[in-house]
Amino acid sequence: MFGEFLSIIVRSIKLDKTLYKDNKNFGEAAIYFAAIIILLTAIIGLIPGSIFLQFMSGVFGSANIQGPSVRSVIITTIIVWLIKTAYLYFVGVVLFPSKTTKCNYRKILVTVGYASSPLILNSFIVDIKLLYFMFIPYIWYNVSLIIGINQILKYESYFKSTIIVLAPIILLFLFFVSQLFNNHSSVVS
């Protein structure tokens, strides 16, 4: 059982698309494997977060900056996992299905959990000099999620799954850029 769990993590990190094609990976234990991966990545995510807070407290001269509690990180991670899965289900299955798309919410929930495996690599970020490398596992996670969504929703090309997965990030980036330009164009008196 533990060997199967490690195999899922390694295959997800290797971006193996057969991980998502094999129905035995979506059996009874799949939801537990996905939940463990999600919780593991949430707890590991505290490492770069605490390093960032230490750096920022040194920059701004404040020694009293505390990060979120482990409980709030776990609860937030589970809520974000459910919301992201609901978004992917609604957009991928309800709005833009392919002709052969037959997928349920649980399968997408497990896929999002499996695709989170590259975020385990954040455990190697133990110094402020390595903090910039935390974007590599996040990009890796998005690529893994694109592959997983493409396989379980049976899309013909990766373009559709890429747009579906990256649309919230693109919209957030565009909002950020628009706010940046709005702040520069206003006059402060």
Where is each model-derived feature located?
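Transmembrane helix-loop junctions in multi-pass membrane proteins
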Residues: 47-56, 120-131, 181
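Selected alpha-helical membrane-embedding segments in polytopic membrane proteins
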Residues: 1-103
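Hydrophobic alpha-helical transmembrane segments and adjacent short intramembrane/lumenal linkers
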Residues: 89-177
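Short alpha-helical linear motifs
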Residues: 57-61, 129-135, 184-189
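Juxtamembrane boundary at the C-terminal end of a transmembrane helix
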Residues: 173-189
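Juxtamembrane transmembrane-helix termini
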Residues: 51-55, 96, 147-154, 182-186
